[in-house]
């Protein structure tokens, strides 16, 4: 359940949402086959961008958090509530439809246990208004970039993708992490016969 808004103009676009990302599972622990419990997870986010297909930039933000009151006390003792803040940028730059660079990078600040003690010293306190760092928090990065060349007689591209270990986004159901995609290169040569 949720609500979303979207605006699109010729080059400018913006979107926002708020809603339930995951429903709570609160089965009776005396049940012989209870399902795995889970907190109700709320999320909100927005994105804004400018540009067309050839040259564009978009910024997006996602905030997700578990509602502790959505789970019975007996389950709360076994399962930690979590929260997450993701900030990302994606863009594309091209030159005369011959050379193009695309990139998508994101930073994820993830807390595995919202009830863990707060970090009160160092650089982590600078961001308290945006994300409250706890002793179970971690910040990780993920991204990819691709460079493509298109000429009448050859098409070539090179790509790099990296996801740091323990990268987590509560806005996705599954994320591969600790992943380095080593620069594959694709080349296609066009040959004309007369």
Give the residues covered by each predicted segment.
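Signature for the C-terminal beta-barrel architecture of outer-membrane proteins
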Residues: 2-194
């Amino acid at each position: 359940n949720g609500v979303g808004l979207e605006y699109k103009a010729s080059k400018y676009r913006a979107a926002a949402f708020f809603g339930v990302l995951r429903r709570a599972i609160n089965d009776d622990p005396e049940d012989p086959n209870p399902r795995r419990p889970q907190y109700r997870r709320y999320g909100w986010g927005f994105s804004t961008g400018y540009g067309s297909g050839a040259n564009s930039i978009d910024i997006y933000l996602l905030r997700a958090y578990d509602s502790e009151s959505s789970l019975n006390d007996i389950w709360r003792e076994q399962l930690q509530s979590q929260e997450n803040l993701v900030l990302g940028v994606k863009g594309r730059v091209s030159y005369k439809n011959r050379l193009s660079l695309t990139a998508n990078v994101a930073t994820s600040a993830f807390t595995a246990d919202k009830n863990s003690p707060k970090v009160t010293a160092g650089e982590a306190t600078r961001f308290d208004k945006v994300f409250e760092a706890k002793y179970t928090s971690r910040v990780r990065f993920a991204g990819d970039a691709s460079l493509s060349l298109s000429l009448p007689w050859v098409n070539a591209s090179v790509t790099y993708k990296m996801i740091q270990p323990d990268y987590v986004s509560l806005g996705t159901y599954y994320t591969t992490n600790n992943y380095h995609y080593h620069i594959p290169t694709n080349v296609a040569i066009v040959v004309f016969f007369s």
